Amino acid sequence: MARAKFERNKPHVNIGTIGHVDHGKTTLTAAITMSLAAQGKAKARNYADIDAAPEEKARGITINTAHVEYETEGRHYAHVDCPGHADYVKNMITGAAQMDGAILVVSAADGPMPQTREHILLAKQVGVPNIVIFLNKQDMVDDEELLELVELEVRELLSDYDFDGDNIPIVAGSALQAVEALTANPGIGKGENEWVDKILSLMDEVDGYIPQPERDVDKPFLMAVEDVFSITGRGTVATGRIERGKIKVGETVELVGIKDTRNSTVTGVEMFQKILDEGMAGDNVGLLLRGMQKDDIQRGMVLAKSGSITPHKKFESEVYVLKKEEGGRHTPFFPNYRPQFYIRTTDVTGAIESFTADDGSVAEMVMPGDRIKMTVQLINPVAIEQGMRFAIREGGRTIGAGVVSKIVE
């Protein structure tokens, strides 16, 4: 059977549902697909479909994630929902499912709970830029004042973590009521059912409040070097996948990381032995570099637009440490532990200087299965930036995954 062509006629945005266990994330995901399916903009997915999320691996870590897609009038969305709390933590830290924005689901009957707070903190740390709120289970709250109180609490909580708590859109409704109405009558249109309308107005807010992400091709050029060859009579070629931006012959790039930063001019761009006018984000290319010897370049360096990225040795990060069952360590580790940090394309040794818990207290040690904030000092400077993902490895196996939350030096 021929594969259906992906129609790129609308801008694409990645979002996900986050929030405390049993507040209704998966039911809301089902309600969104069902209410948009009634308008022919999605394939209806029920709770059981989404809840039976397949396992996938990201940076050596197994995560259960459900991916659904749907469209609104102006956009195409890929939506990720995770069955378990640990899956969210792993997902957000590894960046397995990048989110341009999130829908935070809070049960109006219970108000914000510990995981509500933890997911907001994670969203902040890993760089989910925008959040829209759905106050679920509105049908279980008779008292209008109680609803307002929960809304106030949620806004304060978001402001605590530097989100724009005062202006974030909040929509109240009941995902379950919408799902039940749509199960009984899958063709419900706008204005025919109050609960379905609330889901549609949530999606209007998502459309309006979550900005269109800047596409990778529009960002400054960056490619992490995977391999280096010298071609007799032509010069030195660095290969890798272009992470962002575009590159063409005659442009100047900087070689950043491990050694001192140097400039070079690109004299050729090739992909699969064919000459390209221009390499773009996502392409695997070989770049021919003027005036470079094979020994000047090594795996783990990056080629980037001049001045767009700088090498650093010290950073703060948010890390998930694998459990023994996930192939991680069997024992805890302590400050000054020196594993390898796999950053883009290479391992760099680094010392973990200190650990901090969510409440700011200093932790003495880290157990497998923990999520922790850690300060890392690398032995060589490499090109790193805020929001970048990395893996922590020991003897070739992954023992943790992290994201850079702040550059120190």
UniProtKB/Swiss-Prot annotation:
One of its GO terms (molecular function) is translation elongation factor activity. Mg(2+) binds at residue 26. Residues 136-139 are annotated as: G4. Signal peptide: none annotated. It is found in: Cytoplasm. Monomer. It catalyses: GTP + H2O = GDP + phosphate + H(+). Its EC number is 3.6.5.3. Residues 81-84 are annotated as: G3. The gene is tuf. GTP hydrolase that promotes the GTP-dependent binding of aminoacyl-tRNA to the A-site of ribosomes during protein biosynthesis. Its main location: cytoplasm. GTP binds at residues 19-26, 81-85, 136-139. It comes from Trichodesmium erythraeum (strain IMS101). One of its GO terms (cellular component) is cytosol. It comes from the Bacteria. Residues 19-26 are annotated as: G1. Residues 10-214 form the tr-type G domain. InterPro entries: EF-Tu_GTP-bd (IPR041709), EF-Tu_GTPase (IPR050055), EFTu-like_2 (IPR004161), EFTU_2 (IPR033720), G_TR_CS (IPR031157), P-loop_NTPase (IPR027417), Small_GTP-bd (IPR005225), T_Tr_GTP-bd_dom (IPR000795). Belongs to the TRAFAC class translation factor GTPase superfamily. Classic translation factor GTPase family. EF-Tu/EF-1A subfamily. Residues 60-64 are annotated as: G2. This is Elongation factor Tu. It is an enzyme of class 3 (hydrolase). Residues 174-176 are annotated as: G5.
